Regions:
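Acidic/histidine-rich, metal-coordinating catalytic segments
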Residues: 13, 82-94, 121
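Extended, low-complexity cationic-aromatic segments
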Residues: 1-73
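C-terminal anion-handling pockets and recognition modules
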Residues: 6-7, 123-179
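RNase H-like two-metal-ion nuclease catalytic core shared by retroviral integrases
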Residues: 88-90, 111-133
Length: 179
């Protein structure tokens, strides 16, 4: 069994926050005036949504294996006690030898989801919600973009809403291990 009593369980993934990804949709019979931000701002994001630990978010310039290793160190610093089990997709960075070695050194177990199954990772729902928040915000600088993404991330992770359906579906008899 992978999950043991006292383990911390989290979900990790990258996303690119962009002020031009508008996720708002609506029907209207009247002619609407569309407000569009023409500034091109982007922030790479790595996030770790913990079910029973401290969440972590980072905004690296790149998302290469070195950057992901640094992020794993941050996750460990935020969660210094116990083994950490992280669910990750099959992004090449997550499977890099350097990343696997660093995870092993930090007592972090990386559990890879099946290919083409982003719906199994609750953090994907967080990214979608954060992009929605960004799309309706007036943002003029990269710092504002990062602040909006960070605030949205911690607000959403505090409620566990992204994992509400995941927990009973996949953890049913293991939930007591996380307490």
């Amino acid at each position: 069994m992978i999950l043991q009593k006292g383990d911390l369980l989290g979900f990790v993934d990258e996303s690119s926050q962009n002020i031009n990804s508008n996720t708002q949709r609506l029907w209207s019979f009247a002619k609407l005036k569309i407000k569009k931000n023409t500034i091109h701002l982007k922030a790479n994001t790595i996030g770790c949504f913990m079910l029973n630990g401290i969440d972590t978010i980072s905004f690296p310039i790149r998302t290469k294996s070195e950057d992901f290793c640094e992020f794993l160190v941050e996750v460990r610093q935020n969660n210094p006690v116990g083994r950490i089990c992280l669910l990750a997709d099959n992004f090449a960075t997550h499977k890099a030898k350097r990343v696997r070695e660093k995870a092993n050194e930090l007592n972090i177990i990386l559990i890879y989801l099946p290919p083409y199954s982003p719906d199994l990772n609750p953090i994907e729902y967080l990214w979608k919600s954060i992009k929605r928040i960004i799309s309706i915000s007036e943002i003029d600088t990269r710092e504002e973009l990062i602040k909006t993404a960070r605030d949205g991330f911690f607000s959403l992770t505090a409620s566990l809403s992204a994992a509400r359906m995941w927990i009973p579906r996949f953890l049913y008899d293991k939930l007591d291990l996380l307490c």
